[in-house]
A protein has these predicted regions:
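Active-site-adjacent beta->alpha loops and helix N-cap segments on the catalytic face
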Residues: 34, 83-92, 152, 199-219, ...
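Catalytic beta/alpha-barrel core
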Residues: 77-81, 107-108, 128-130, 169-171, ...
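Catalytic cores of alpha/beta
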Residues: 64-66, 238-246, 283-301, 341, ...
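Short beta-strand/loop segments at the ligand-binding rim of alpha/beta enzyme cores
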Residues: 47-52, 100-105, 221-231, 269-284, ...
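Short beta->alpha transition motifs characteristic of CBS
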Residues: 78-83, 126, 130, 138-153, ...
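Glycine-enriched alpha-helix->loop->beta-strand junction motifs that scaffold or abut catalytic
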Residues: 70-75, 245-251, 273-276, 294-298, ...
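The conserved cystathionine-beta-synthase
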Residues: 56-58, 108-125, 132-133, 151, ...
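N-terminal capping/small domains of soluble enzymes
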Residues: 1-117, 122-124
Length: 362
């Protein structure tokens, strides 16, 4: 777009600051480090226990790191340099980790042989399985301990002969504490979850409960599963929908320059099509924030501040990160939209400076 502004006037730029340009001014405080509350919203509906996200880079975040990030209270954002099918598997891998009620339960039939069930459990990596009929009614439970004697003398015997038919079950509203008490009282390691008709709906295991107790500060969704984010391109609506259906909590519109009207239009369309929160980025100015805060669940800030990012070198475009965060936060805070500072964080102090400038997470 043509401008009547003289070229020389364009050089009269306002001051803009980055991390090395500022320090926090010390002030009086009674807050001890271990008493600090670091919980923060990273999007409209997702709260973290620490304000830290991992980068959506193919050398950084896949399901393993995303799982550990959520266990520590943060958020892992899966990169998009993979097929949609691989992405779905990665999301599901995070969601399965540490879940209290296992939904994808490995089950046995009473008419299978002991050898068949032993092979199945070895293949699926489980040490026991509920025994159900064709209607998923729980008839019993079978474990490696039940099977072991039969493998020596009667591996063709049926599961109904080897299973434990006195099954301790629980309903959907069971708490981790209640499930643990059931296991302790009855000396068992797994409790099938059933509906009012005794149909199997899930399974709680001792290992799952202990894993959850180990990570008591983990960031979880309303079902108790670990939270996970997924990066998608601005024109990848199909990938965004697949991520949403797989259970992703946040879809990140991943673009080097999100202050592009086509990007904003497609981001708005994606937001209308998915149930997950949608975070839009990256932007670096007040004007960009004004274009997206009316629909975005979060805004990601950073035009080339990263140590290996070449955006500023290649395009000659960018904004010093402290000023960029502050400008975007001025707008986003008026709409209760969280701000994420993306890039340029070299030291822990830089993260603190970004938060002081208005970021909710880094």
């Amino acid at each position: 777009m043509a401008s009547d502004e003289p070229f020389s006037e364009k050089l009269r730029v306002p001051e803009a600051l980055t991390f090395d340009d500022v320090l926090l001014r010390p002030k009086e405080s009674r807050v001890e480090p271990d008493a600090a509350d670091m919980t923060t919203r990273v999007s409209t509906n997702v709260t973290l226990n620490i304000p830290v996200l991992s980068a959506a880079m193919d050398t950084v975040t896949e399901s393993e790191l995303a799982t550990e990030m959520a266990r520590q209270g943060g958020l892992g954002v899966l990169h998009r340099n993979m097929t949609v099918e691989q992405m779905v598997e990665e999301v599901e891998e995070v969601k399965r980790a540490d879940e209290l009620i296992i939904r994808d339960v490995v089950t046995a039939s009473p008419d299978q042989t002991v050898r068949e069930v032993d092979t199945m459990m070895e293949r699926e990596g489980v040490s026991g399985a509920p025994v159900v009929d064709d209607d998923d009614t729980v008839l019993g439970i079978i474990s490696g301990t039940d099977i072991r004697p039969y493998l020596e003398v009667g591996e063709s015997d049926l599961v109904r002969e080897a299973m434990t038919d006195e099954v301790i079950t629980a309903h959907e509203d069971v708490t981790p504490r209640q499930a643990l008490e059931l296991m302790y009282e009855h000396k068992i390691e797994r409790v099938p979850i059933v509906d009012e008709d005794d149909h199997l709906t899930g399974l709680v295991t001792m290992a799952g409960i202990l894993a959850r107790r180990e990570y008591d500060s983990a960031a979880r969704d309303e079902d108790g599963s670990l939270v996970v984010g997924v990066a998608v391109g601005p024109f990848e609506a199909d990938r965004a929908q697949a991520a949403d259906e797989a259970g992703a909590d946040i879809v990140f519109i991943d673009c080097a320059h999100a202050h592009n009207l086509d990007v904003i239009d497609t981001a708005r369309e994606i937001k209308a099509e998915v149930d997950a929160d949608v975070v839009v980025g990256n932007v670096g100015t007040r004007e960009a924030a004004e274009e997206i805060v009316d629909f975005a669940d979060g805004v990601k800030v950073g035009i080339g501040p990263g140590s290996i990012c070449t955006t500023r070198i290649v395009s000659g475009s960018g904004m010093p990160q402290i000023t960029a965060v502050a400008e975007v936060a001025d707008v986003a805070s008026q709409h209760d939209v969280p701000v994420i500072a993306d890039g340029g964080i070299r030291y822990s102090g830089d993260a603190i400076k970004a938060i002081a400038a208005g970021a909710d997470a880094v």
